[in-house]
From Swiss-Prot:
The lineage of its organism: Bacteria, Pseudomonadati, Pseudomonadota, Gammaproteobacteria, Enterobacterales. It comes from Escherichia coli O139:H28 (strain E24377A / ETEC). The modification N6-(pyridoxal phosphate)lysine is found at residue 708. The keyword Oxidoreductase applies. The glycine cleavage system is composed of four proteins: P, T, L and H. The keyword Transcription does not apply. GO terms for molecular function: glycine binding; glycine dehydrogenase (decarboxylating) activity; pyridoxal phosphate binding. This is Glycine dehydrogenase (decarboxylating). Its EC number is 1.4.4.2. It catalyses: N(6)-[(R)-lipoyl]-L-lysyl-[glycine-cleavage complex H protein] + glycine + H(+) = N(6)-[(R)-S(8)-aminomethyldihydrolipoyl]-L-lysyl-[glycine-cleavage complex H protein] + CO2. Belongs to the GcvP family. Keywords: Oxidoreductase, Pyridoxal phosphate.
Length: 957
């Protein structure tokens, strides 16, 4: 045997698991594109002046088992205290049936945002259920399909209040003093760039302040008080002030709906519905508003529509509000939200139903009543007479109480003057309450749970009678049927089967990087050591998290060529916003706050101008030349015209046209020459890692889509993570946090997310990916992603022209197929091709972005040659079908493309088409068939007849 022991140990085994084509397949594809090796291909495509001479030093690869063992040892450093800190985060009991069949199921977590509704009906139904939960609990008319977290939802509510306000000259936003501090932090950050003045005061003093356009109230208050805001809201409404309420989703099960009290906007975190705290996230926020404000709402909204056969079908509604269409005029820069987490919360509500939720909420409240009664019986004073689950307890010996709590491995809220906060949750037991008595009163308190229970059961006054809900919730059949595990398992499976995810087929979406989310990467997110930590626990209890985050940040620094990384932004859009704020504050620190012009190429993703607008900048568009590259002449002219007002440029690399622009360094130099900063959008980082880096190119700041390049799954539309890398001069200006000091960051800036490290519990996914790939594997992943894209481009270019290419006719990691000539010749559009691909078992590529009338294809490195060939064969077969239309064999108004997709029912229905059933549903010999459950959606009907809540079950049958 000639192999060494090191070779037999094969520490790089995961690289071969992650990268789809094996060595032989890679060579076949290299031969097809006319390159000798991966290095030779990279050398041809990537400009030589930006190629790294040595790979980033992120270590050697590790096997899946070694990496898991290493991360487990790190996770074990976290201390799992019982946390009663509250402040919007509580422990939960995630039903195992949802854990196993959704959170651990690639059929749910590897799907993409449901832009293609025909292959997304399952998660769209779950999201519609989430919206129904929101509507029932808030008492309002219109709900979104989730936002990023409660604090960012508050910032969105403020912005929305200003948009809809009739008080056009008012510029002040009032925040009640008992709003969660992290929420206030994020609101202040957003208000600064919008030029709003934030006033913080007791809610009852709001009428003392003038020029207020909006008010934010908290129900229940951060220290536990239940407020009856009915009269106050009525008075505010009479003065045309827009009222927003941040609400506790579990408390709303028992309390009067804020919408019934007159609130215009209600939002909050859905974390309590089954989603672990995870050191801060990810969690879905719910958001609801009055019907009259629906077109000003942020985020995705799922609506009920019809398909081509007239059957009920679901889709994302009113997309004209969103950043990918309205750009800087969009309601928000929100792109990805928190679909996977919203669906967990949705199914939690389905599984428990109204009876189960009331039982949970009443149990939490009863235990809180028992705790309150015992403490008061022993002479302790409560700050609030009315509460749901949180007590604010005045204590004389606060230091002693906190010391006893620490000894008992209990976290209490400690930032309240002369008091401690205690928030109970669905995991709290009578034994926990007895332990709390001992912490607060000493071991010899003599209290008994059953005795106290009898007292409070007959005489509980902790919720005002006027604040008790008097209407029924969750009356729709979906919330009253699936309560056995068998029924729930089958319901979830029925939803999963309606969708197309990576566990069934390649998802070739350009600019989305739908790569493998490996099982080994996903395993740690359910470890209790990561899942159960409160984001505001003492730092010494989170040493495992701190070590993992620091190590991941160090790797990202080396991979990006930056000097520091901030982990707080919990989406790519938030990363853009945070990066632009860093630039803004940097200019202000140099007395150049007047620099507010952001240059953005015409090809940019819609989030870029939307984020620039949110950061208080003016957008100036830079033209692209005929080859799709930034027009340097126009760039120089625009930069010179901006002069001392130039803030930055936002540029994507490789470009959104799928090309490594040769002049990228010159672009950076021009902007720097005029005093601007370079924001390099990290959306296409998968074509940079190990080959080049933003810092080496000359950029100053980038966000990194960990849910693209670094393997966090898309979750059907979230979660995402968008940490930012910065050069040293921008490091003092990254987001900070008002509750937790972020170690290693000397920033005094406000927060952009509720938690200091954003969605911390999914960071282990990226840690595992980098650890298992090592420097060698990461570079190879980028190279194979480039190879796969060029292989597709070379094989399809005769049938579908590749719109933009770089040097030697090559593309980067994605390519744009130009459908416009075919449409002119035949009338068949990119939409028809996208829908026909469903019949072949594929999710469509990205449609009409960045160029209308095109399809953008990104295969990633994870797809094998077999799958690439299957996609190519499907596209070529579709081209042959188009030729049939062109030749007149099939009429333009009745052919397999315009009628696509085809569903099972059509196999047994009357058939009057000029093509066969076999051509319709088994084209080109498709064997492993994916069946969509609806035909093509009627988008116009959906927006004209907007309906965003659950429809009768019969509509789905």
């Amino acid at each position: 045997m000639t192999q060494t022991l090191s070779q037999l140990e094969n520490s790089g085994a995961f690289i071969e698991r992650h990268i789809g084509p094996d060595a032989a397949q890679q060579q076949e594809m290299l031969n097809a594109v006319g390159a000798q090796s991966l290095n030779a291909l990279t050398g041809q495509i990537v400009p030589k002046d930006i190629q790294l001479a040595t790979p980033p030093q992120v270590g050697a690869p590790a096997t899946e088992y070694a990496a898991l063992a290493e991360l487990k040892a790190i996770a074990s450093r976290n201390k799992r205290f019982t946390s009663y800190i509250g402040m919007g985060y509580t422990a939960v009991q995630l039903p195992p049936v949802i854990l196993r069949n959704m959170l651990e199921n690639p059929g749910w977590y590897t799907a993409y945002t449901p832009y293609q509704p025909e292959v997304s009906q399952g998660r769209l139904e779950a999201l519609l259920n989430f919206q129904q939960v929101t509507l029932d609990l808030t008492g309002l008319d219109m709900a979104s399909a989730s936002l990023l977290d409660e604090a960012t939802a508050a910032a969105e509510a403020m912005a929305m209040a200003k948009r809809v306000s009739k008080l056009k000259n008012a510029n002040r936003f009032f925040v009640a003093s008992d709003v969660h501090p992290q929420t206030l932090d994020v609101v202040r950050t957003r208000a600064e760039t919008f030029g709003f003045e934030v006033i913080v005061d007791d809610a009852q003093k709001v009428l003392d302040h003038q020029d207020v356009f909006g008010v934010l109230l908290q129900q229940v208050g951060t220290t536990g008080e239940i407020h009856d805001y009915t009269a106050l809201i009525s008075e505010l409404k009479s003065r045309k002030i827009v009222v927003s309420v941040a609400a506790d989703i579990m408390a709303l099960v028992l309390l009067t709906a804020p919408g019934k009290q007159g609130a215009d906007i209600v939002f909050g975190s859905a974390q309590r519905f089954g989603v672990p705290m995870g050191y801060g996230g990810p969690h879905a926020a719910f958001f609801a508003a009055k019907d009259e404000y629906k077109r000003s709402m942020p985020g995705r909204i799922i609506g009920v529509s019809k398909d081509a056969a007239g059957n009920t079908a679901l889709r994302m509604a009113m997309q004209t509000r969103e950043q990918h269409i309205r750009r800087e005029k969009a309601n928000s820069n929100i792109c990805t939200s928190q679909v996977l987490l919203a669906n967990i919360a949705s199914l939690y509500a389905v599984y428990h139903g109204p009876v189960g939720l009331k039982r949970i909420a009443n149990r939490i409240h009863r235990l809180t009543d028992i705790l309150a009664a015992g403490l008061q019986q022993k002479g302790l004073k409560l700050r609030h007479a009315h509460y749901f689950d949180t007590l604010c307890v005045e204590v004389a010996d606060k230091a002693g109480v906190l010391a006893r709590a620490e000894a008992a491995e209990i976290n209490l809220r400690s930032d309240i003057l002369n008091a401690v906060g205690i928030t109970l949750d669905e995991t709290t037991t009578r034994e926990n309450v007895m332990q709390l008595f001992s912490v607060l009163l000493g071991d010899n308190h003599g209290l008994e749970i059953d005795t106290l229970d009898k007292d409070v059961a007959h005489d509980s006054r902790s919720i005002q009678p006027a604040m008790l809900r008097d209407d029924e919730i969750l009356t729709h059949p979906v919330f009253n049927r699936y309560h056995s595990e068998t029924e729930m398992m089958r319901y979830m499976h029925s939803l999963e089967r309606k969708d197309l995810a990576l566990n069934q087929a390649m998802i070739p979406l350009g600019s989305c990087t739908m790569k493998l989310n490996a099982a080994a990467e996903m395993i740690p997110i359910t470890w209790q050591e990561f899942a159960e930590l409160h984001p505001f626990c003492p730092p010494e209890q989170a040493e495992g998290y701190q070590q993992m985050i620091a190590q991941l940040a160090d790797w990202l620094v080396k991979l990006t060529g930056y000097d520091a990384v901030c982990m707080q932004p919990n989406s790519g859009a938030q990363g853009e916003y945070a990066g632009l704020l860093a630039i803004r504050h940097y200019h202000e620190s140099r007395n150049e706050g007047h620099r507010d012009i952001c240059l953005i190429p015409a090809s940019a993703h819609g989030t870029n101008p939307a984020s620039a607008h949110m950061a208080g900048m003016q957008v100036v568009v830079v033209a692209c030349d005929k080859n799709g590259n930034i027009d340097l002449t126009d760039l120089r002219a625009k930069a010179e015209q901006a002069g001392d007002n130039l803030s930055c440029i936002m540029v994507t690399y490789p470009s959104t046209h799928g090309v490594y622009e040769e002049t990228i360094r010159e672009v950076c130099e021009v902007v720097h020459q005029f005093g601007g900063q370079v924001y390099l959008d990290g959306a296409n980082m998968n074509a940079q890692v190990g080959i080049t880096s933003p810092g080496f190119i000359g950029a100053d700041v980038s966000h990194l889509n960990l849910h693209k390049t670094f393997c966090i799954p898309h979750g059907g539309g979230g979660p995402g993570m968008g940490p930012i890398g910065v050069k040293a001069h921008l490091a003092p200006f990254v987001p900070g946090h008002s509750v937790v000091q972020i170690e290693g960051m000397l920033t005094r800036q406000g927060a952009v997310s509720a938690a200091p490290f954003g969605s911390a519990s999914i960071l282990p996914i990226s840690w595992m990916y980098i650890r298992m790939m090592g420097a060698e594997g990461l570079k190879k992943a980028s190279q194979v992603a480039i190879l796969n894209a060029n292989y597709i481009a070379s094989r399809l270019q005769d049938a579908f022209p590749v719109l933009y290419t770089g040097r030697d006719g090559r593309v980067a990691h994605e390519c744009i197929l130009d459908i416009r000539p075919l449409k002119e010749e035949t009338g068949i559009s990119e939409l028809d091709i996208a829908k026909r691909l469903i019949d072949y078992g594929f999710h469509a590529p990205t449609m009409s972005f960045p160029v209308a009338g095109t399809l953008m294809v990104e295969p990633t490195e994870s797809e094998s040659k077999v799958e690439l060939d299957r996609f190519i064969d499907a596209m070529l077969a579709i081209r042959a079908e188009i030729d049939q239309v062109k030749a007149g064999v099939w009429p333009l108004e009745d052919n397999p493309l315009v009628n696509a997709p085809h569903i099972q029912n059509e196999l047994v229905a009357e058939w009057a088409h000029p093509y066969s059933r076999e051509v319709a549903v088994f084209p080109a010999g498709v064997a492993d068939k994916y069946w969509p459950t609806v035909k093509r959606l009627d988008d116009v009907y959906g927006d004209r007849n907007l309906f965003c809540s659950c429809v009768p079950i019969s509509e789905y049958q």
